[in-house]
Amino acid sequence: MPAVEKSVITDWKRLWPMVSGIHYETPQDTVREELMNVASELQAGVLQFKPKNASSLELGTLLKEKKQEKLLPFTERLQDLLDLESAQCWEILCYYLTQEYRGSASLLTQLISTETNMAKLHEDIRHYYSLERMVVLKIVKNLIVFHQVPNHPYHREYRAVVEKITIPRLRDSYLDQLESLICEVPPRKLMAGECFHSAERLVAWSERNAREINEVLHILLVLAEHLPMGLEQIKRIFAACKQHSFGKMQSYLDDSQPYHQEIIRSLSYSELMLVLKCLDFEKPEKHSDLIEKLIEDLQVDIASMYHRPEHGPLLLAWMLLRLRGTNDADDASSLLRCRQLGKRAVDLKCFVQLHLIARHSMYADDSMLSRIVRRTIYNQVGYLCDLFDGDGSCARYEGIYELLCELVSWPHLAKDFCSREDDGPCSLYKTLLENFPLELTHLSKLALSLTKAGQGNYVKSQLEALPILALRYDESQHKLREVDTNEFELLASVQPFQQIDFTIPAGTSCTAIQHPSGCFMHFRFPVNYFDALHHEINCLLRETGHLHGDFESSERIRNVEAGLRFLESAVKLSQSISGISAEMVHPTEMCVDLLHTFKSVQYPPVGLLSSCLNVCTALLPLVDEEIFSRISNLHILPTVSPGSHYDFKMYANANGVGFESRFLGSVIDNVEKKRERYEFLLSYIGFLRAYSNLKRNRQIQMEIPGLIFLLKDVFPHLHTWHFSSQVERNKIYFEILSFICDILDLFNTAKESNCKQRELLVKVCVYSLLNLENGLILLRFVGVGNAYVQYTMELETNWMQQQPHGLMMLVRLSMRILMQLLRLKEEVYGNSETLSPLEALIYTQPKQRDTLRIIPTVCSYMSNIFDRWLPILSCRLLKRIALQFNMSLLACLDMEADQIRLTFMQKLPDELESDSIKIAILELVDACIAKQPGVTEAFFKVNYALDKRSRSFFSKDCVPNIGESIVTYMRDFLDALQVDPLTIQQALPAKIMTIFHSMWKHNLQMLVDDLVKDKQFWKKLCSPLFSELQPNLRIYTQLLNIISIEVYTGNGNNAALLDVMNKFFEQKNFGPWLNYVFNMPKVPAVKNLSSSDHLPDWICCLQAFKDLIVILLKKQPKFVTIPESQFKLMAQKCLVVLVDRSNYLEDMRPFIILAELYVFILLEFKHAYTDSLEEEQTLMDLLLQLMNRICACYEDQHVRAKEACLAIVTKCTHLYTDLLIRDSSIALRFLNSVVGIICSELQHMENSVSLEKSQGLNNSDSSDSKTSTNSLILCLNLLKAVATIFHNDGPGNWDLPFVSVRLFQRLVRCVSRTLPLFSKQVLSVQLLDVLIVFAKGHCSVEFLHCDVGEYLWLKLLPPRELLQSKHEFTKTTAADAEGWTVEQWWPVYARGIELVTIIYEKHKKCFLEDAFQFVGIHAVFLEDALLLSKQSLEPSAMYLIKAAVNLVASLTEHHKEWKQDSDLSLANLMRAVQSLLCHTSSLFHQQKNLKCLLAGRRSQLEILRSTEALIVDDELISACNDLTDIIISCVKALLRFSPDLMELLCCSAYEPSKHSILLDVKFGAPKLNEENLTLTFGIVLNLVNIYVKALNMQNHGFSEVPLNSLPNVEHSGDNDDPEVCVGNQTNRTFSKPLSNVSISTGTCPASELLSNMDGQLCLLALEHLLMLVASQAICIIRSPNLETLWKQIVRRDISNELLIFNEFVRRKVILDYKENRSPWLRRKHGLCKLKCVDPVRSSSSSSRSSEIVRRSNTNNELRVNVVRRLHLQQQQRTPPPQNFDMSSDLSPIAAAQGAAMTTSLDGRKRLYPAQQAGDAFLEDELAAIELQYFPPPTEPGYCELSQVQVVEEDYLQLMSALFNVMPHCD
C-alpha cells in the first residue's frame, strides 16, 4: 500500500502486532525504536486524541490544502461523529483507507455518493477509531505488565521505555485519563440526535467509553503493584469510582441486555478491585500514617456504602484495614463499629461476591492482572482468618470455602497456601480436618483445587493420614470413659465404616463436640480419606432406593461427586498402577457400580455419573483393557453391530449397521437438555478421546460408534440446544472438533497392514463432514469472518492470551479440518470430478447466490492482528481450495486485482511481518500458478501505471510500495542470490525458487519476461549450482528442472543459458556435481505419509539430474555438447555407483534412476568408451557384478529396474562384442547370467499365464501383465543380440549354457502358452522372433529335439473367435479392441510360418515330416494367407503372404513326398499360388487398388473417393518391391512342377507325359478382373516386360562379376590378381533408355514407379520368369496333345511380347551390338589356357579350387548345368554350411554359395552375398543329410583350347537366343 507521510498521530493498529510479542519475530531493535518514537503518546494514552474544539484549524481549510474539497461533506460528518480535531480526523480517515479498507476504488466512490452508504462507511471508520484508542491502552498495559518478565521477548525494550516515561508519570497520566473518561460526554450532535442512527451510535459510544474506563482501571491496578498508591491517588480513585457508583451509572446502556450487563459488571469489579488493591497493606505498621489519613478521609463515605452487593467486599476490606492498621481492636466502641461493618459485609454475601470476581472472565487467566486480583482477595481472606478464625467460626460464612477453592486452584497461591502452618487461610483447612468427614464436600473440592494447582502429592499425603475422624455419637457402639470435660477414652474398638477394613482401637482419645446436626465424637486416630469416600459410596448405593429420584438435594450424592472428582485428579497424578494405593482401589472400582446402579434411574444424577466416567477415563492409561471391558458391559455408550460392514456410507448414515446411542442418548435428551448443562456428554467425549489416543484398534467398538453419535446427534444440532453458559457450548464444540482432528490425523500416521477399521473410521468422518448436515456447521465457524472474530477479541481483557475454548480457537480448528477434508476427499469420492455437498457450498456460483461467502471470508482472516496463526491458516486453506477448485478462484474471491495484491503482496516486503505468513503467501502463489490463472495474473501484474491505487488518492506524498508486485520481490531475490548464493538455504528464498519452478513447469515464464530478458538472469538464478553444494536442498532439483524445461522448449538460441551450461560442464564444477548427485545414503528413504508426493531431496535431485542429462543428449549438438571427457567420467561414475547401489535394494528408487540414466548414456556411444584394455576389463567386471546381483534377487526387482538393467546389458553386449568373443571366461560368466535372467523371466511368464488361464482372464490387459511382458521382451532382445554375436564369432560351445538349462525347449513351451492369449500378442511375436534367430544359427539342431510340432502346430491355429464356419481367415469377428482381430493375428502367424520354413531349410528331410504335418493342419489357413492379397496388403498382411509363399516354395522341393502325404493340400496350395501370382501381376496395373489395399480398411473409402492423381510415394514403391519378392517365390514354386530347361534342351528323348502344362494359352491381353483368373502366358510375359522396362528405365548395367572359378587353369601373370582381371573388363552403361517396343504405356505401370523399384529384385524376378516362360513354352510347343493353333499362339506371343527383352539384351549384353548383329556372339571373360589334368587328382590337390555341390533344391540348376555341360568339367564341391538368410533370394543362375566375390567394383547390392568359408559342420550326420555328393565323371575331362568364366549377362543372352529361335523351330 502507499506509505502515508509523517502524521500527527500513529497507526496504532499496525503497531500492536509489531511490538506486542504475539508474533515473536519482530527484531528487538525495531521494537525499541518504534516504542521510543511514541513514548509521549503512550504516556498521554487516549488524551492524545484531541476533541474537535481543541484546534482552530478548520476542516475545510485542511481539505483545500490537500486538494480534496470533494470529500468535505463526508469528512465533516465523520468529524461530528468522532469529535476529533481536524488534522487527527483527516489522519484517521487516511489510515483507514490505506490500511484497513479492503474494497475497490470504484466501490469507495459509491460509498461516499449517498447518505446511506456514507453512514455505513462512517460506522466502519468509527469502529476503526475505537480500536485505535484501545490499542494504545493495550500497548501501555503490555509495557507495565511485561517490563520485568524475563521470558517475554521484548522485556528489555519495554523496560527501557518504561524507564524513559517513569512509573509515576504513567500513574498520574492514567489517573487523569480515568477521571476524563468518567466525566466524558458524547459528541454534541449525537446527543442532539442530528446524526444518522443517533441512538445506536450513542450506545456504541457508551460501550467504547466503558471499555476504555475498564482498561484504564486495569492499567492503574497493575501500576499499583509496581508503585503503591499514595493518599491523593487513592482519594482520586475512590472519588472517580464513587462518581458513577462503581460503574453502575451508565446513561446509554440498557441493563436488560446481557452484553451491557456484562460491561457494567466488569466496570464494577474492576473499580472495586482497584480500591481493594489500594487498601491492601501487607505490613500496615509501615503505613500507619497513611492508613490513619485514609480512615479519616474516607470513613464516612465507605461506612455509608452498604446497599449493594459490591459494597460487601469494600466493607470487609475497610474493617480489616481498621483492625490491622489502627488500635480499633483495643477500643470497645471502635471494635463494635468494625464488627458492624463486618456483619454488613457478611450480610451482603461478600465472600460470594469475591468468588464471583475471582471467577470472572477478566481474571480467568494467569496474567499479572489476574494474579494481582487473586492475591488481593487472598490477602483479605488471610487477614480475616488471622483476626477471627481462632475458633473456626469463619468456616461458617457463606461462600468462603468456594472462594478459597477458587483462589488456591492457581499455582502461585496454592504454593503459598501449602507453605503456611496454621496462619492465614490454612486455618480454614484445619477446620475441615478437625471436622472430617462432616465437611467432606468442601475438603474434596479444596483438595481438587490444590491438585490442579500442582500440589497433588502434598494433598494426597495429607488426606491419606487425616488426624481426626468425627463420628455421630452412638451410645450402643461407642463405649467411652470420661477423662475430662468433653474428653473421653474409647473402651472398645469401633469399626466406623461397614464392610471396610478400618478399626479405631480401644484407648483412642476423643472429644465430644456439639454440631447443629447432633453430638459428634472426634476421635484422634489417623484415618484415610479414601476409606471415608468408600464408605460414602457404599451408603449411597444402599440409600438409592430411598432417594425417590431426588438427587439434586442429596448431601450424600454431593459428597460422593466431589470425592470422585478428587479421586480422578489423584488417579491422573499416578504414573502407574503402583501409584494407586489399596484404599483408592475400591472407590475406583465402585465407579462402575455407580454407573450400573443409576443408569436405570429415570432422571439420574448426571453430575455423579460424569464423575464416575471421568475416573474411568483417568484409569484408561493404566488398565485400559479392564476399563473397556467393564464399560462395554454396562451398555451405556453408543454401539454398532460387530459385523464386518466396511461400507463407510452405511456407517456415516447410521443405516443398517445397528447403531444405538443407548443410555448416553437418553440421558442427554431427558436430563441434560432440561438442566442446560452437559457434564455427562463432556465426560463421554473425554473418555472417547482418551481411549482413541491409546490406539488399541477397536474402532468398531469405540471410535466409530462415538463418531457416528457425535456427528449424527450432537454436532449438527448443538447450536439449537440451550446452555446455561456459552463457555460450555464452546467447550463441547472444541472437544468434538479436536476429536475430528485426531481422526483425520490418523491418515498421516504409518499405515499398518490390518488397519481396515482405522481407514473406515477416517472415511466415515470425511464422508459425514462433507455432507451438508455437518459440513454446514463447520462452514459456519469458518465463515464467522475476521470482523466478528476480531471484535470478540477486542472485547477480551487479555489480548496476549486467547481463551482455551474461545471463538478464535474454534475457527482455527474448523479451518484446519476443512483443509484436511478437501485433501482427503478422494478417499471417499475417488478421483471423480463430482463436488461433494460441502464443496458445492464453498464454490457456489454465481457469486450472487453465495450467501456464506466462505472464500472471501477466509481471505478476510489475512488482516487479523490478534492471532498469528489465522492469516497463515487462511493462506493454507486458500491454497488447498486453489489446488482442488476446478473453477475460477478469482470469481469466488469477488475482489479486484489490486485488492488481492493489497491483501497478500503487501506483507512480503514488510520486514516486520513474520516469515511464517510470508511462506504461506508464497505457497498460495505457487498453488495459484498451477490451477488459478486469474489470481496468478493478479499476483504477477507489474504494470501499475494506470492503477488508481498507486496514485495518491488524497494528494499525500507517497512512496511506491514494493509489495504491490511479487515480480519485484522476485527481482530482489535474484539480486540477493547473486551476492550470496547460499541465501537459498533460507526458507523464504527457497519458496521463491519454488515459484520459479512452478512457472516453468506450467509454461508461464511469460509472467516474468522482464526478469528473463535481463542478460544476467540465468547467471543469477543458477548461481547456487556453482557455489558450495549444501546437502538436502530441494532448490537444486528445481534449478535442474527449470534448466531442463528451458532447454527442451527453447530453440537453442539462449546464449546466457548456454554460458551457464558450459560452465556447469567445466571440470571444476561438473566433478563436484557428480560427487554430490551420486552421494546417496545407504539406508532406505522414509516415506512421508502426510504428503504423498514428498520424496527425499537427494532422490529428487538425482531424478532431476537424470532428466537434464537425457534432455541435453537429445538436444546435442544443437544446443550444447557435453565434453567427451566429462561424459566418459559421468559414465564411469554412474556405473560404479549403480553397481554399489545394487547391494542396497531395500529402496529401489535410486537404483532405478541410476540404471535409466546409464541406459541413456550408453545409447550415445557407438563404440566402446574405454580407452584401454584394463579399463575395458574393469568395466566388464562391474557389468558382471551387476548382472550377478540382478540374478541373485531378480524376482524382487522393480520392473523398471529390470528393464533398465536389461537395456544396459544389451547395449554393452553390442559395445563390447570383441571382449566377449576374446575372453572365454568372461563370456561364460556373461552367458550364465543371461541364462539365469531369461529363465527367471520365462518362469514368471509361465506362472502369470497359468494364473490368467485359471482366472479366465484371457483378454486381460492389466498393467502388471504389460510390465512383465516388457521385461521379458527386453530379455528376448538380449538373447537375440547374444545369439547373433556368438553365432558369428563365438567359440564352438557358446550355446552350452543354453542347452544345459533346456532353454530352447522352455522358449517353445512358453510361446505355446502365450500364443492363444490376446494380452500376450506382443510377447508371442517377440518369442517367435527369438526362435527364428536361433533357428537360423548353429542352435537350429536343438529344435529337432524340442517337439516343436507338438507344442506349436495346434497353438498356431487362429484363435477361436477368429474361426468361422467357412474359415474365412480374412474377416474380422472380434471387433472389440480387447479381443483378437485378424490384423493382430497376422504378425504372429507369419512368424510361425517363417519359423517352420527356416527349420526346414536348415534340416531338410530331418524336418520334412514335421513340416508336412504343419501344412496338413494349417492347409486351409495357408491357402487363406496366400489369397490374403485380395483383401489387404498392409505390412503385417504382406509379411504373412511372403511367409506363406516362401514355405510353399521351399516345400515344393519335395513335392513328390508332399503329394503322397496330402495331395489335396498340395493341389489347393499350388492353385492358391497361381491365383496369388495372377493377382499380384494385376496390381502393377491397378495402382489405386494397390493403394487401397496398402492403406487398410479404414482409409480405403477416402482413397476411392479421391479424384486427384495418384502420387507415387515410398509406400507404393516398397509395396511393388514386396510384390516382386512374392512373384519370385511363386515362380520358384511353379518351377518345381515345370520341366527342367536343360533337360528339355539337352536330353535326346522327350517324355511329355512326365510334365504338366502350368500356363494357360488365351487370346488377347490379360484380364484385369479378379474373378476366375487363371495364369496365362500373357500374364507372365506381361510381368517379363514390366521388369525389362524397369531395368531399362533404371539404366541397369552389368558389372560382369564372374559366377564361377576355373579349376586346373594355369593363370598368366596378368591374371594372377583377380581384381586386375575384373578391372580390365568393360563396364557398359547406357544413358538413354530403350523404347517400349511392343508394350504400350497404357499396359505398363507408371514410369516413376518402375524407375524407383529395386533393380536387383527386378533382375532376379526377370531371371525366374524367363526360365518359367522358356520351360513352359518348350513344353507346350513339344506337346503332342495340343493343337497347332495353340502352339502357334505361343510362338507369336514369344515373338511379339519378348521383343523388348531381346532389344534389351542386344543393347546391353551383346558385344559391339552395332557392328555385330549376330545374337550368338558372346564375350569371353577370364580367357585362360586349359591344362588337362586328372579330375580326381585336381579336386584333391588344388588348394585354390572351390567345391561345387548340387543341393536338393533346383534353384541353381540351370546355370550350373549349362556351364557343366558346355564349358566345365563336372567336379565334386563341398560348400561350407552357412546361415540361411530369409532376406536373400536365390537366383536360378547364382554362383555356388561358396564362391567368393572377386571385385569391389560392384556398385549394386547383391541379393545373394558370398559367405565366408571355413565354418565347421554342427554334426556329421546332418552334413550327410544336407549334401548330396556326385561321384567324379567317368568320361575323360573335356578339353578345349581355352576356358572362360560365366557372368550374369550370359544367362540373359542365352535366354534371348533361345526365344529368338523358339518361334521358328519345333
From Swiss-Prot:
Q: Please give the biological process terms from Gene Ontology that the record holds.
A: mRNA transport; nuclear pore organization; protein import into nucleus; RNA export from nucleus
The annotated phenotype of a deletion mutant is: Lethal at the pupal stage with stronger phenotype with temperature increase. Impairs sensory dendrite tiling on the larval body. In escapers flies, leads to decreased negative geotaxis and seizures.
Which Gene Ontology cellular component annotation is one that this UniProt entry carries?
Answer: nuclear pore inner ring
* Primary role: Component of the nuclear pore complex (NPC), a complex required for the trafficking across the nuclear envelope. Required for proper protein transport into the nucleus.
Report the locations given in the UniProt record: Nucleus, Nuclear pore complex
Determine if Nucleus is one of this entry's keywords.
Answer: yes
Q: Which Pfam families match?
A: Nup188_N, Nup188_N-subdom_III
Subunit record text: Part of the nuclear pore complex (NPC).
Q: What is this protein called?
A: Nucleoporin Nup188
Q: What keywords sit in the KW lines? A: mRNA transport, Nuclear pore complex, Nucleus, Protein transport, Translocation, Transport
Segments spanning the bilayer are none
Q: InterPro entries attached here?
A: Nucleoporin_Nup188_N, Nup188, Nup188_N-subdom_III
Record-stated family = Belongs to the Nup188 family.
Whichever gene encodes this chain, its name is Nup188
MF terms (GO), sorted A to Z: structural constituent of nuclear pore
